[in-house]
Design a protein with these regions (language model features):
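Subunit-assembly interface segments of extracellular/virion macromolecular structures
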Residues: 1-181
């Protein structure tokens, strides 16, 4: 380890990127807040299973892909929330976010535990007022950094900077947690 540390210190400053893990900021991290239950079932039971799924609004026809989520207990507003990348405007060609009080439909099955929501059936309803908003997020892609004499692999990570607004005033960085195994 001593040789690696000396080599690293010769070529890299503390905290330097060795293999670039691109750092990005997304000021348009679209959020949609959901009712707590759908057909009597808490949606928190399958919220995490929605990441990566394509969804659409039952009435609006707006389409999006789910990229992240937060459960109601972690939400500043107390609602289960999906973060989305919108891909298609509505049936009227002007609506570009899901409507308030609209049922959402997944294009593929949602499996959780021993249960399943079949594709093309509603799985959740947006809240009745102010369901759509824009948050912001920062992402670090997979890479390697030189930290405290070690080459440290960092996995892709996303942090929601502001849950429901796009005017953050934060500093984002990596936190190093050292453990002896």
């Amino acid at each position: 380890q001593n040789q690696i540390e000396k080599f690293g210190q010769h070529f890299f400053k503390e905290g330097s990127m060795v293999i670039p893990g691109q750092i990005g900021y997304d000021p348009l991290y679209h959020a949609i807040e959901l009712e707590d239950t759908f057909l009597g079932i808490p949606i928190s039971e399958y919220l995490d299973k929605l990441v990566g799924k394509k969804i659409r609004g039952e009435i609006s026809g707006v389409e999006a892909t789910v990229v992240n989520h937060i459960v109601a207990t972690k939400s500043e507003r107390g609602h289960n929330t999906l973060y989305l990348k919108y891909s298609k405007s509505g049936n009227d060609f002007t609506t570009n976010v899901f409507n308030d009080g609209e049922n959402l439909i997944a294009s593929s099955d949602i499996e959780y535990g021993i249960s399943r929501v079949i594709a093309n059936n509603p799985f959740a309803t947006t809240i009745a007022l102010g369901a759509a908003s824009i948050g912001s997020a920062a992402t670090v892609q997979e890479g390697v950094y030189f930290v405290r004499g070690h080459f440290v692999k960092v996995n892709t990570q996303t942090v929601i900077v502001d849950q429901y607004t796009d005017t953050p005033s934060y500093r984002v960085g990596l936190f190093i947690d050292e453990n002896i195994v």
